[in-house]
């Protein structure tokens, strides 16, 4: 899977929500405890869009992301940042024919991502939403449109996890910085957008904290701990 080792080994981290809410892993048990896979029909429709648009495709199976060889070899050519390129090279498994690969595993996919230019995002979103059944479309970075099952999404999956742990939304806190975090931030009482987050994220969140480079998470936690005390 693509969960960084530093996250898996970080003290106190017991569960990890991945694939934009498509799955939950138990760190202690080392296995998946929840999943919401794409439907076969959705995958086949996504492949048709990929062939028409000729965009790079990523697919995730059991937490492992696969992508086209040229993209994994040089992500910066596809508008990835320098940091993003390192992450892509370290986590993505290259595939020669991504459409054939996706078709072969059509009933196993956690999620699908389209790598696109920023100016194509709105048009692509409209196409995906119109042409692919039973999906949830979101975005975490400017050059990606991410597709999951309609019942996925970080917010819905966080609610599932809270119920499992017998924690109410009034007792939960979440932090995020991108559009794909909005459903999570609005599903709990203490949902906080990072100061460096996207405009949509900051507008939607109940609270906004400082940036990630200025200890925004720590400041957000301390803000409400002081109120409790």
Residue positions per predicted region:
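Active-site phosphate-binding/coordination module
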Residues: 1-79
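A general structural signal for well-ordered alpha-helical segments in protein cores
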Residues: 3, 43, 121, 125, ...
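Short hydrophobic/aromatic-enriched beta-strand-loop microsegments
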Residues: 13-19, 77-79, 136-138, 191-195, ...
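Mg2+-dependent phosphoryl-transfer enzymes with acidic/Ser/Thr/Gly-rich catalytic loops
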Residues: 130, 145-229
């Amino acid at each position: 899977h693509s969960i960084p080792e530093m996250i898996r080994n970080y003290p106190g981290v017991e569960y990890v929500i991945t694939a934009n809410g498509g799955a939950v892993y138990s760190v202690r048990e080392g296995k998946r405890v929840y999943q919401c896979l794409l439907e076969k029909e959705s995958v086949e429709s996504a492949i048709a869009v990929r062939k028409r648009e000729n965009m790079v495709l990523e697919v995730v199976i059991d937490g492992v992301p696969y992508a086209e060889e040229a993209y994994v070899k040089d992500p910066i050519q596809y508008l990835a940042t320098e940091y993003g390129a390192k992450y892509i090279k370290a986590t993505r498994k290259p595939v020669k024919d991504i459409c054939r690969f996706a078709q072969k595993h059509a009933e196993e996919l956690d999620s699908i991502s389209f790598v696109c230019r920023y100016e194509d995002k709105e048009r692509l979103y409209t196409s995906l939403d119109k042409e692919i059944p039973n999906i949830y479309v979101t975005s975490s970075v400017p050059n990606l449109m991410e597709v999951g099952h309609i019942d996925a999404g970080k917010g819905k999956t966080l609610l599932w996890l809270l119920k499992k742990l017998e924690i109410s939304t009034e007792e939960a806190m979440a932090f995020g910085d991108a559009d794909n975090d909005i459903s999570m931030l609005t599903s709990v009482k203490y949902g906080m957008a990072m100061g460096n987050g996207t405009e949509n994220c900051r507008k939607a969140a109940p609270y906004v904290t400082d940036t990630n480079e200025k200890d925004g998470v720590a400041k957000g936690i301390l803000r409400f701990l002081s109120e409790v005390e």
